[in-house]
């Protein structure tokens, strides 16, 4: 799942996450 680490930050683990408000990442298999 996703682990929130800040206002717009998440640590990705096979899920769609916002990378500290800079870039939106969608990691497989949830692309």
UniProtKB/Swiss-Prot annotation:
PTM sites of type 4-hydroxyproline: 29
Keywords: Disulfide bond, Hydroxylation, Ion channel impairing toxin, Knottin, Neurotoxin, Secreted, Toxin, Voltage-gated sodium channel impairing toxin
Coiled coil: none
Cellular-component GO terms for this entry: extracellular region
Listed GO MF terms: sodium channel regulator activity; toxin activity
Tissue specificity: Confined to the epidermis and to the mucus layer.
Main location: secreted
Disulfide bonds: 2-16, 9-20, 15-26
Compartment(s): Secreted
Tagged with keyword Secreted: yes
Keyword Disulfide bond: yes
Family: Belongs to the nemertide family.
Record function comment: Potent toxin, demonstrating strong inhibitory effects on insect sodium channels (Nav) and reduced activity on mammalian sodium channels. Potently inhibits inactivation of insect sodium channels of B.germanica (BgNav1) (EC(50)=9.5 nM). The toxin also delays the inactivation of most mammalian Nav (human Nav1.1/SCN1A; EC(50)=171.5 nM, rat Nav1.2/SCN2A; EC(50)=50.4 nM, rat Nav1.3/SCN3A; EC(50)=170.2 nM, rat Nav1.4/SCN4A; EC(50)=810.6 nM, human Nav1.5/SCN5A; EC(50)=155.6 nM, mouse Nav1.6/SCN8A; EC(50)=147.6 nM, human Nav1.9/SCN9A; EC(50)=129 nM).
UniProt note: domains: The presence of a 'disulfide through disulfide knot' structurally defines this protein as a knottin.
Note: Negative results: does not show effect on rat Nav1.8/SCN10A.
This protein's name: Nemertide alpha-7
Organism listed in the record: Lineus ruber (Red bootlace)
């Amino acid at each position: 799942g996703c682990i929130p680490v800040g206002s717009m930050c998440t640590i990705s683990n096979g899920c769609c996450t916002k990378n500290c408000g800079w870039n939106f990442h969608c990691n497989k298999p949830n692309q």
